[in-house]
């Protein structure tokens, strides 16, 4: 069992070195405080040392909802709100002493899902015994890894929910809403798209729900988005969106209509979810 794990870990380490990933930038005051720009299509490198804790800090408006790793038995993950604490731990081997964390063999991938975004990491257990300054730089661990997010586009007017820089007539506003029992608290007051992005606008002070795109087979996938004033700007246009917050659920349907022939938002009195 242990030998198989060591062989698999060795192969994983080889595969890790063969792929590109985003390396965080060390801080000017302390290299262990690292920053990386967020991009939904990039894998980020996280370097840890045995006996130390690393924390990954996501956007303050995010909440971690799921964490998965390829070698979960060798790592401890503790999510708290928008912060994920990571620490290497011994591998429990049957019939033999537990294997202590070993640099290289503990390398794995880490996937994090929040209520706003998806994140992908290469998680590396680096060695503190670097023979050269270059090797030390490559093994530089992170006490804190934080993301820098792209600025949300400025709305043309705070009084208007329309954010896209396209003529109003080019917007598709034909959206219908199906509200679950007791779910009015997460219902948007407007929905529209410009063919590339979808806007869901909410009342001031209203909490934002998690947003999922629904596939034809019913599978739900968390979407990437950013916040623009009182709107969630979803980085895609989908036939069906599902909004969720606790037990509250709302279904948003894109009716693909001509904006000039439809009201701003159709709130249908459909059967509850």
From Swiss-Prot:
Q: How does it assemble?
A: Forms a complex with PtlI.
Q: Where is the signal peptide?
A: 1-20
What is the annotated role of this protein in its UniProt record? Component of the type IV secretion system ptl required for secretion of assembled pertussis toxin (PTX) through the outer membrane.
Q: Which Gene3D superfamilies match?
A: 2.60.40.2500
Q: What induces it?
A: Cotranscribed with ptxABCDE. Activated by the two-component regulatory system BvgS/BvgA.
Q: Establish whether keyword Acetylation is in the entry.
A: no
Q: Which UniProt keywords apply?
A: Cell outer membrane, Membrane, Signal, Transport
| InterPro entries for this protein | Conjugal_tfr_TrbG/VirB9/CagX, VirB9, VirB9/CagX/TrbG_C, VirB9/CagX/TrbG_C_sf
The UniProt entry's sequence similarity note says: Belongs to the TrbG/VirB9 family.
What is this protein's record name?
Type IV secretion system protein PtlF
Checking CDD domains in the record gives:
VirB9_CagX_TrbG
Q: Which gene encodes it?
A: ptlF
Q: What is its main location?
A: membrane
* Pfam families linked: CagX
- GO CC, alphabetical: cell outer membrane
List where in the cell it is found.
Cell outer membrane
């Amino acid at each position: 069992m242990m030998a198989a794990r060591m062989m698999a870990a060795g192969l994983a380490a080889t595969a890790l070195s063969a792929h590109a990933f985003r390396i965080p930038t060390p801080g000017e005051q302390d290299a262990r405080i690292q920053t990386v720009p967020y991009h939904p299509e990039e894998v980020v490198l996280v370097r840890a040392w045995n006996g130390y804790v690393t924390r990954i800090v996501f956007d303050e408006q995010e909440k971690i909802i799921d964490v998965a790793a390829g070698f979960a038995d060798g790592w401890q993950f503790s999510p708290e709100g928008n912060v994920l604490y990571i620490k290497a731990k011994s591998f429990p081997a049957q019939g033999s002493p537990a294997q202590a964390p070993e640099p290289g063999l503990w390398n794995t991938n880490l996937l994090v899902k929040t209520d706003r975004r998806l994140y992908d990491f290469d998680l590396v257990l680096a060695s503190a015994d670097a023979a050269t300054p270059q090797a030390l730089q490559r093994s530089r661990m992170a006490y804190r890894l934080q993301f820098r997010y792209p600025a949300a586009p400025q709305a043309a007017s705070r009084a208007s929910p329309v954010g896209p820089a396209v003529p109003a007539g080019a917007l598709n506003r034909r959206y219908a809403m199906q509200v679950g029992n007791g779910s009015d608290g997460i219902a948007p007051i407007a929905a529209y798209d410009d063919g590339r992005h979808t806007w869901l606008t909410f009342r001031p002070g209203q909490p934002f729900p998690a947003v999922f795109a629904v596939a034809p087979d019913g599978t739900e996938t968390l979407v990437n988005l950013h916040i623009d004033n009182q709107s969630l700007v979803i980085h895609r246009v989908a036939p069906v969106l599902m909004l969720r917050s606790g037990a509250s659920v709302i279904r948003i349907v894109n009716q693909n209509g001509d904006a000039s022939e439809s009201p701003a938002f159709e709130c249908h009195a459909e059967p509850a979810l």
